Amino acid sequence: MKRIAYIIPGYGESHLRQRGYNKVAKFFEERGIEPIHVEIDWEKRNPKKFSDYVAQFLKVYKKPRGAEVYILGFSYGATTAFLSVTKAKPTALILCSLSPYFEEDFSGLKPTWIKWFKKNFTKSDYSFDRLAAKIKTPTYLIVGDKEPDACLLRVKDAKKKLRDSYLSIAKGAEHKIGQKAYLETVRKVISKL
């Protein structure tokens, strides 16, 4: 059976610039899963829309008949993966440091950040609760214990609201997929697939 994993980087990142994504790809290869790096043009337009990032991902996404397909996203890439899951219908989803920019998160963010986000990301007010209710895909959540509180709260809330979800906390890790502690947690999650 063919096994494929799509890897969506964080905002402004790429496997060409951040080596952590290539290490993640190797973890998939060790499990007999073919990694596919997804390049997102984060600066394609201004103001930005998450729906544009989802469309870019779905343009390269393929699910061969009978194949197991996994989607791993980091930060904004995790949000892109989450927003695309009902259309992509993967075998499992791995959300690394899911961004806390859903409607339910705004009350815990600084007003200046919310103002910037709403100015630069139009039509990107998504309700996590409404989307989570539609998701039946097994979801692995990863977050570093040294990440900002908003990220930790978003991921812990996701664990409660997603039916078939598993939470792994990377001890000593910040919001950096290339950090050794973060990568070790990603490796452990991938080893379960």
Language model: regions and residue ranges:
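Short, surface-exposed "cap/lid" segments of acyl-processing enzymes
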Residues: M1-W42
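Gly/Ala-rich beta-loop-alpha elbow adjacent to hydrolase catalytic centers
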Residues: L72-A81
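Active-site nucleophile loop of the alpha/beta-hydrolase fold
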Residues: I94-E104
